Amino acid sequence: MKYILSIDQGTTSSRAIVFDKHANIKGLAQKEFTQIYPQPSWVEHDPTEIWGSQLGVITEALANSRILPNEVDAIGITNQRETTVIWEKSTGKPIYNAIVWQDRRTAKICDQLTKEGKDKIILEKTGLVLDSYFSGTKILWILDNVEGARQKAENGELCFGTIDTWLLWNLTQKKVHATDYSNASRTLLLNIKTLEWDDELLKILNIPKAILPELKESSTIYGETDKSIFGAEIPIAGIAGDQFAATFGQACLKKGMAKNTYGTGCFLTVNIGKEPIINHERLLTSIAWGRKKTVTYVLEGSVFIGGAVIQWLRDGLEFFRKSSDAESLASSASDNGGVYFVPAFVGLGAPHWDSYARGTIIGITRGSTKAHITRAALESIAFQSFDILNTMKKSIPNFEIKELRVDGGASQNNLLMQFQADLLECKVVRPKITETTALGAAYLAGLASGYWQSAEEIISLWQVDKIFEPSMPKNQKEKLLENWNRAIERSKSWIQNSNSL
C-alpha cells in the first residue's frame, strides 16, 4: 500500500498529513513556531525554524501513520503565500528573517509607486493590487536594507523563494530552486497572461532576475527528496499556495464554484476558468493551479485577520483558555448587544485595502460583556467575508452563488457558519474532510505521480459533513450590515503618520 504525504506549512504552524487513496487521514502532526514582531505592523518568521519544525512534523506524521518513507508515493507541498525568504545560494543560509504576508513595513513603498502610476501596470499584468501584502516589495526591502544584499543579488549569489521554494530547496538539498504558477502569481513579478517573470515588473521593483526560481506547473515532478533526509528518494510532485490548494481540495474544479477558508485570515476564492478577469473592484486575480499545460484562474478576496481575532481574545485579553471555547462563550449571548468589532490589527484587506486602518471595538456600554465582544469578533469574520462576496457579485458577469464550501479551523464553529449563511443568503457547506489545504496539495501530487487518475476521481472523493441554510429575517440582516459598515468606516485611515506603520 502506498500513501501521499502532504506538507502544509502555515502562518502559525507547520503540519504534515498522510493520506490514503480514499483521501482518509492515516496520520498527522503539527508544531507551532515563533511569531516575531520587531516593530508594530512588522511580522517575521525564522526560516531555519520553519524548516526544522517542518522536518520534525514529517517524521512524526510518518511514525503516527506507522508507514516507512519508501511507502510514500509522492509529496505535495502547500504553504502560506507571499511570505518572502532570501538566502545565500552557496550556504543555504537566509540573509534575513522571512517577511510574512501580514507584514506592512513596505506600505510607504507601495504609496510611492502608486503616486508614480505603477499600480495600473501592476494590476493589468499581475491581477493584483499594489500592496505590501505581496512578495515584490518585501524582496525590495530586504535587498535595500540588508548590508551587501543588493550586490550579492546582482552577482547571482542569492536565491529568493516563497515558503514552498524554501522547503523544496532544503528537501532536495540545494538541487531544485523552483516554484509553481500559483505561488508565483502572488509575488507582483509574474505576468499571469504570459506565465513568465516580467522584465518590466522587475524593473519597476528593482529586483534582479537572477534570484528568481524556475516556474513550473502545480502538478508535476519537481525532483526527489535527498536520501540523507528520510533515507529514501521520494518524488515531490505537487505545489500550490495554501488557498489554491484548498480550492482544489474542495473540488471547486468547475467555473463558478466558490470556497472560503477560515484560518488566520479568511480567503474566499471563486473559480473563473481558463481566462483571467482583471478586476477593478480591488479583488485579486490569481493562478490557482497549472496542470496538463493549462492554468485555472481564481478571483480572490483576502481578509487579513480572521481566526486570528479569536487567538487575540485568547492570548491578548485572556477571555478563554482554548480557541474552541469561543463558540460557547459567544452563544451565551443571544446577540452582539450592539457591539461591532473590526479586527484591522494590520490594516484592512479586500475590498478596502487600507494599510492605515486599525482595530475598532465600538458600541460598548456598561451592559457589554466578554460574551458580546467574543460574539462580535466571530461575526466580524463573517461580515468581512460578506463584503468580499458582495464585491465579487458585481465583478463577475452573471455570477450567482448557490453554495459556499468552507474549510479551515474556524469552519468548525457552528455559530459562525450559521451566521455566514444568514448574511450571504446561500447554503454554507462543510465537507467531512476539512483538511482541504493539505488534501489539495496531496491531490496535485497524486495526479502527477499517477496515484490518482483524473479530476473526476478527485470530485468523487468530496463528501458533505453539514449544510447550514440561511434563516435570518431580511430586515435583521440589513440592520446588522448597516451597523457593520458604520463600524468599518470608523476604523479606516486611523494612522495619519505613515511612520507609525
Curated annotation (Swiss-Prot):
CDD domains linked to this entry: FGGY_EcGK_like
Any one GO biological process: glycerol metabolic process
Superkingdom classification of source: Bacteria
Enzymatic class: transferase
InterPro entries from the UniProt entry: ATPase_NBD (IPR043129), Carb_kinase_FGGY (IPR000577), Carb_kinase_FGGY_CS (IPR018483), FGGY_C (IPR018485), FGGY_N (IPR018484), Glycerol_kin (IPR005999)
Residues annotated to bind ATP: T11, T12, S13, T264, G307, Q311, G409
Binding site for ADP: T11, R15, T264, G307, G409, N413
Pfam family, any one: FGGY_C
MF-aspect GO terms: ATP binding; glycerol kinase activity
Pathway(s): Polyol metabolism; glycerol degradation via glycerol kinase pathway; sn-glycerol 3-phosphate from glycerol: step 1/1
GO-annotated cellular components: cytosol
Catalysed transformations (reactions): glycerol + ATP = sn-glycerol 3-phosphate + ADP + H(+)
Binding site for glycerol: R81, E82, Y133, D242, Q243
Activity modulation comment: Inhibited by fructose 1,6-bisphosphate (FBP).
EC number of the protein: 2.7.1.30
Gene3D superfamilies associated with the record: 3.30.420.40
Amino acids binding sn-glycerol 3-phosphate: T11, R81, E82, Y133, D242
Keywords per UniProt: ATP-binding, Glycerol metabolism, Kinase, Nucleotide-binding, Transferase
Its biological purpose: Key enzyme in the regulation of glycerol uptake and metabolism. Catalyzes the phosphorylation of glycerol to yield sn-glycerol 3-phosphate.
Family affiliation: Belongs to the FGGY kinase family.
NCBIfam families referenced in this protein's UniProt entry, alphabetically: glycerol_kin, PRK00047.1
Official protein name in the record: Glycerol kinase
Lineage, top ranks: Bacteria, Pseudomonadati, Spirochaetota, Spirochaetia, Spirochaetales
Encoding gene (name): glpK
